[in-house]
């Protein structure tokens, strides 16, 4: 048998915005989660669903940082890609951007099977901020788009079960501290791309697991799935049963439909054009859930599509597959165990009523289940040629625990400057002081790292990180004590003062929080060494929080003073133009505030579901919100 699968490098050039630096301030506040069902609404749900809805929901982004440094100025940029192809399919993978499959082309017909976004435009939809639309994405961690959406993954060539080659992607997911892998290959003579996925729990305790594979397809596609009912989750933020099909192109607001596929039925979902051609996704039974997401036909949904993909590019909808029935649930993964499954993506032409029969002809279920079993031993095969490098966090965890994770090596050579102080803490029991004055690096917060911080010499730098870890653990009083202990001897006060200000706000002490924020910003301005990326990001992040805290307690003149201290380039960013409009309004300068809107601005990091622009506009004007600012995801009456 001649194996014709090829894996090669490619460079894509497309209009792309810069990702920019991460926000250097630790994310201490609770998550603003729109995908949440109230306790009282769970009583009418199936018992297993209600239990998993309440099982270990994510409460903090730590140790991950927020990615909000991107803008909206797009220029032609090169993006590294890996292409896996045979004579039937060509898949284009972006290892530096979450391992996204950006394109899947059926070569005999030339059809693009996915929605291929013509631009790279991050927006605030991932758990930690930056996310982009299009293709097939791998979501792991917790309800929402993964924190790895715009992060690099490790990638390498690996032998495939049929004697050809696989492209392996792997990384360490930091919210739950779990290693995972995605093996992509094209079986000889097949029209399907296979994706073997494995998530491992190396810990001595159970861990909540979340996985959803999301596929963007053109918006005009008709979705077909083997279910009669679905669980609908819309702008009311309630789960309710709905018949299938219960949705059409006139759905006004964004909505999710989680399909209730009967036990024993094959797991699949498909999307077809008007001529009956399209994409089908199927999996082994481990990947239980299927879902459709639409932005809706209302002005807010249309605006979001333009925001993510540009004007005139056509919209998209998503078909998805996950471990649980809904994305609001997390599944228990027992100690020292793993879960794996096999997915397939490929072309299918069929009438809606004959999809399952056509799928069985194209990819028999028994044959596919056997392919999963045949792949499992290959999941442990050590990678060959490395094609891309991810983060060093997995290497640090493997170094700490001496875990053996065959198939997904986390080599010490991947450790970088970010991991260096934590490696030193692991080796010597001491967290080293920074060699130069700069904003603090990220904090590790897992129990084993917190224990090491508690026994390390109590320097101000260590106390800062210990406080962040204690805050994450829910020990807020002890976190405050750690930060306060560090203040008298700390060479850099602003990181500690900012943490204490957040604590004050959480306890309702807003006057004291504003004072601490003002002191923190003054200290940062004195300490700032240059206008480089790190210091600029710190000043912008802390400046924004400080202005907001001062406005909250009506210290308007002080808020204006902070605003005027910000760099001109920072003040021109859309987020700060919105803040300026609010500042002008509370100063009594309504006409000037309205002029900010009339001049136009774009809040690059506008959060999905945020109504901040609309609320401020309502305070300024009686007219309807201009279309360019309308990102509404629910009726204004709610």
Language-model regions: role of each:
Residues 1, 43-85, 136-190, 220-222, ...:
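Extended, loop-rich substrate-binding clefts of extracytoplasmic carbohydrate-active enzymes
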